[in-house]
């Protein structure tokens, strides 16, 4: 853990504890190294823009169960962990982040992305700054 660039936390506007919280979100959201650093950038961009993080894993954490598909009612759960309803980071980590997730949180990829979605069968995510592009991907996903 000492080999991590903890000095970057301040540059990102985060405390070390907030880095751990963010890394826990990355741990639950991104399966691949390339995606981890991009998810980290999305989180940082959304925090800076004061946008809701809208992380499904935080809703699952609030529900106390991991689900393949969340329902409309799930997204309305009143919990500080629900990043659809409450702005900013959740109050505590939602998982135990690994070193790769911590490093991603401290060294996010450069980019202006605000949205991401799993768009490939192997679980890789696509990233965009465009809400209309994000909606298009969701529609394609829903269509099968």
Q: What positions do the PLM features span?
A:
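Bacterial extracytoplasmic/cell-wall-associated proteins, especially those involved in peptidoglycan
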Residues: 1-144
């Amino acid at each position: 853990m000492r080999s991590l660039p903890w000095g970057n936390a301040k540059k990102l506007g985060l405390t070390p504890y907030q880095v751990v919280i963010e890394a826990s979100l990355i741990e639950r959201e991104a399966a691949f190294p390339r995606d981890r650093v991009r998810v980290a950038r999305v989180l940082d961009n959304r925090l800076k823009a004061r946008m809701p993080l809208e992380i499904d894993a935080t809703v699952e954490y609030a529900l106390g169960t991991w689900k393949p598909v969340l329902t409309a009612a799930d997204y309305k759960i009143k919990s500080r962990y629900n990043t659809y309803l409450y702005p900013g980071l959740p109050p505590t980590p939602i998982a135990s982040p690994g070193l790769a997730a911590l490093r991603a949180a401290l060294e996010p990829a450069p980019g202006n992305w605000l949205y991401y979605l799993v768009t490939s069968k192997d679980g890789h995510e696509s990233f965009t700054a465009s809400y209309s592009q994000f909606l298009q991907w969701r529609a394609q996903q829903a269509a099968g």
